[in-house]
Amino acid sequence: MKKLLAMFFCLTVVVNAPLAMAEDAKTTEKTTDVVLIGGGIMSSTLGVYLQELQPDWSIDMVERMDNVAEESSNGWNNAGTGHSAFMELNYTPDNPDGPINISKALEITEAFEVSRQFWSYQVKNGVLNNPHSFINSVPHISFVWGDENTAFLKHRYDAMQHSTLYRGMEFSDDPNTIKEWAPLVMEGRDPAQKIAATRMPIGTDVNYGEITRQLVDAMKTKSNFALHLNSEVRDIKRNADNTWSVTYADLKNGEKESVIKAKFVFIGAGGAALQLLQKTGIPEADLYGGFPVGGEFLVTENPEIVKRHMAKVYGKASVGAPPMSVPHLDTRIFDGKPVLLFGPFATFSSKFLKNGSLWDLIGSVTFSNVMPMTHVGLDNFDLVKYLIGQVMMDDDDRFASLKEYFPNAKKEDWRLTVAGQRVQIIKKDDDKGGVLKLGTEIVSSQDGSIAALLGASPGASTAAPIMLSLLEKVFKDKVATPEWQSKLKEIVPSYGQKLDGNIEMTNKIRSYTSSTLGLDYIEVKPE
């Protein structure tokens, strides 16, 4: 028996010695006020807010890549749409029995107006530079065909004209007019095909990667900000004093681990946010699971083609398709150079990040979310069927899809590019077991000391209002102070007000942001 105990003791020492040594190797590098996990549009937006609201707070940003904005915020990893609900038909679902509900569209439009104000303030204060490096006017067009879809689009247009936010939108079912708006879409099209389109001249194309880089560059000029690149967060633990210890590994230095102790932690790590949230142990994390969906685009840089299309043309999603999969033919602008993208085509990978691990999905499954995830799979057969169909597509299938929007397209002009990964939220539900949540959701601890952003579209375009909501949720007392209220209204002049229905305020805000960002402007007129 003694020999057995001795062997067990020795084995325990052998197994645990490396762990103990690793623990000893950790060093509490510093104590800080705020840790931002992830170097994307969300973390950078929150960081700038906090620097402007509370300049004395120290902030550390931890990013696993060798630069910021390398995952979903990177311009090539997303559609670059300034989501304003001008053309995205999924925000206004059809209702054959009554008026179309535009409430979700209004929510998206109001949110993007906040982003425009946030960016304008940063331009005025030298945080962002050269607005055309990150945002440009590109008309937003909805384009459909067939009796049912054209009737829906007219129905939608009529409903949206009752809102002051959509004045200036044009509707047409005349092929010649639509050809003026988007010539590539019309050339070579069957003249007998019934078509319709709406056009909003004040739409935008946005490079969220460029915004992120500029925001972080500005943050780096402050002495109480530190950026840790090539640093992967390995653990997040609550301390006895309700602070948090964030352990990260230096991927360029033998994965040496360091610890930062922080009063507040934000997990803005895109698809990786779910697994990091689960590491915190907060009960709120138990409500969530995630399902990854990737994307690919066809792209052309042929100048003869690109110069003849200056628009984002969105179609109608297939039944069961997620919002991010609405087909669109887009003008994109990178470093001043326009290109055309078409897609997205959904892909499947078990990775939660483009540069993630194939074990991400399996690693995120827990006792608390396995049943909600199962229920969502069973209840969303159309989505599963759609994804299978997308994954099975070959080059000919993708090109056939392109020709529905660009009939005269030639294969040799286009190449396939892989975009970023998204993780759709799956949330526990008392009635259904689990539901697939579209959009984004802030998850925070009860005491507000840690928060994460889960979900996908519209995402980046509404980073400023989403982070504003986070401030209101986790820094409620601070937001209520005269100092923060005054600064927030300076950053976002419409803070606390809705633009819809307020013509004077809408014109004032849009005129201000358009002139500051160098964008097209349309004065809103009474109905």
From Swiss-Prot:
The keyword Oxidoreductase applies. GO terms for molecular function: 2-hydroxyglutarate dehydrogenase activity; L-malate dehydrogenase (quinone) activity. Its EC number is 1.1.5.4. It catalyses: (S)-malate + a quinone = a quinol + oxaloacetate. Coiled coil: none annotated. One of its GO terms (biological process) is tricarboxylic acid cycle. It is an enzyme of class 1 (oxidoreductase). Signal peptide: none annotated. Pfam families: Mqo. Pathway: Carbohydrate metabolism; tricarboxylic acid cycle; oxaloacetate from (S)-malate (quinone route): step 1/1. InterPro entries: FAD/NAD-bd_sf, MQO. Its cofactor is FAD. Keywords: FAD, Flavoprotein, Oxidoreductase, Tricarboxylic acid cycle. PANTHER family: L-2-HYDROXYGLUTARATE DEHYDROGENASE, MITOCHONDRIAL (PTHR43104:SF2). Belongs to the MQO family. This is Probable malate:quinone oxidoreductase. It comes from Pectobacterium carotovorum subsp. carotovorum (strain PC1). The gene is mqo.
